[in-house]
């Protein structure tokens, strides 16, 4: 299976580029595709909060813009926390879960989030998207 350490580190590294002047809560995501490509994303806040975009969706949209489609995604890692602090548990929001369900097999797609970093080692939670979004909306 995927190299979770590499994916978690990419999410944590991406978090540094978050644009979060209003909340101060930075989120980074790293989305792994079947060909081994990792697409990163960050949350991008806006003074009009409705225009804000989450890190997970930023990563998905970058991958889709690059031609990736349903079946091309293996896992996503998320790192969130204070802009200048250590990560705290940050599961994906409902909108991000729904967007992920559009492009993945929820039963096999892995969702990871960093829970803490101790002495350089990242602890994380691991779930399938189906566990996090039972009964996803589908057409």
What are these regions (language model features)?
Residues 11, 29-30, 59, 63:
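Small-residue (primarily alanine) positions within well-ordered alpha-helices
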Residues 19-22:
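Short Gly/Pro-enriched turn/cap motifs at secondary-structure boundaries
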């Amino acid at each position: 299976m995927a190299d979770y350490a590499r994916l978690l580190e990419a999410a944590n590294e991406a978090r540094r580029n978050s644009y979060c002047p209003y909340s101060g809560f930075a989120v980074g995501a790293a989305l792994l595709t079947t060909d081994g490509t990792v697409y990163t994303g960050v949350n991008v806040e806006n003074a009009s909060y409705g225009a804000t975009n989450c890190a997970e969706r930023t990563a998905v949209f970058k991958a889709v813009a690059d031609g990736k489609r349903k079946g091309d995604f293996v896992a996503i890692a998320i790192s969130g926390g204070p802009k200048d602090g250590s990560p705290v548990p940050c599961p994906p929001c409902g909108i991000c879960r729904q967007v992920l369900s559009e492009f993945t097999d929820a039963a096999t797609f892995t969702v990871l989030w960093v829970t803490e970093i101790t002495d350089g080692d990242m602890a994380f939670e691991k779930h399938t998207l189906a566990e996090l979004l039972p009964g996803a909306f589908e057409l």
